[in-house]
Regions:
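Polybasic, lysine-rich low-complexity intrinsically disordered segments
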Residues: 4-5
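Aromatic (phenylalanine/tyrosine) cluster motif
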Residues: 25-28
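His-Asp-centered metal-binding catalytic motifs of divalent-metal-dependent phosphohydrolases/nucleases
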Residues: 80-99, 105, 109, 130-138
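An active-site-proximal "capping" alpha-helix that borders the catalytic cofactor pocket
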Residues: 64, 105-117
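Divalent metal-dependent phosphate-bond-processing catalytic cores, especially two-metal-ion Mg2+/Mn2+ enzymes
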Residues: 32-33, 49-76, 89, 142-248
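Hydrophobic, well-structured mid-protein blocks that either form specific transmembrane helices
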Residues: 116-149
Length: 248
């Protein structure tokens, strides 16, 4: 009897330790109810502020949060609610890439997001974290993220600029800017300066190929590198099909 009781207590203790360990290394199990509560509220705020840019639509916001969720698994110390809020609200102010105040958009989005969150009784102690994560997510703003939450959001947003979806977003955005697909005679810019404002294909080498090296987390870098190969392979194939040899 004593032996059975001892074994039962040991099993219960082991289960408790496993549960504690899981809680430590998987923060979503502790915060899931809070995230579930806030996700529809954040979606409502984000949807109300969306424009007509399909490269920065609600699907983009969902993908950024999905990417961030993957990175959060590697960073249990991060505040998942701060990351979720910044993931969904980072584009509340979204100026075109050729707009003269594009570099200010993330600061404007951060200020608007914090005002709206405060009105929704979002935890006040988390607002500064959300503000910083939104301000520093932008490539155009060129602001360094100083918190793990901001690093995760920046990586998550930039990962969506890579891979097959990133490629589609690239050409969609280029069309909105009236850019040509590629330079007629030199698509790979072998004998000319890169110009991604004039030629969509140039954007891969000008910016996107550099993103993996700028990732803030190891997990983000690994995801970015795996997706970059899709763009570089496309660029090579595109150039082969695009360049037409002069008739003999």
């Amino acid at each position: 009897m004593h032996k059975k009781m001892h074994l039962a207590k040991s099993a219960a203790l082991q289960a408790a330790l496993c549960h504690t360990s899981a809680s430590v290394f998987h923060p979503f199990r502790n915060m899931q109810s809070l995230l579930t509560l806030w996700q529809p509220r954040l979606l409502a705020l984000a949807t109300a502020g969306l424009g007509d840019d399909s490269a920065h639509d609600i699907a983009h916001l969902h993908r950024v949060w999905r990417n961030a969720s993957i990175l959060l698994e590697q960073h249990p110390e991060a505040d998942a609610l701060v990351v979720m809020a910044a993931s969904y609200l980072h584009d509340l102010v979204n100026l075109p890439k050729n707009h003269p105040e594009r570099h200010l958009a993330s600061r404007q989005a951060a200020a608007l997001a914090c005002r709206q969150l405060a009105e929704q009784d979002f935890p006040s102690g988390k607002l500064d974290g959300v503000r910083h994560a939104i301000e520093t997510h932008s490539f155009s703003a060129d602001l360094a993220p100083h918190t793990i939450e901001a690093r995760i959001v920046q990586d998550a947003d930039r990962i969506d600029a890579l891979g097959a979806v990133g490629l589609a977003r690239l050409f969609y955005t280029a069309a909105r800017m009236d850019s040509a697909l590629a330079h007629g005679a030199d698509p790979l810019a072998l004998q000319r300066p890169l110009n991604d404002k004039a030629y969509a294909l140039d954007h891969i080498e000008t910016k996107l190929a550099k993103l993996p090296g700028k990732m803030q987390t190891q997990a983000g870098r690994a995801l970015a590198e795996s997706r970059l190969s899709i763009l570089t392979d496309f660029r090579s194939t595109f150039a082969q099909e695009w360049t037409i040899a002069p008739a003999a």
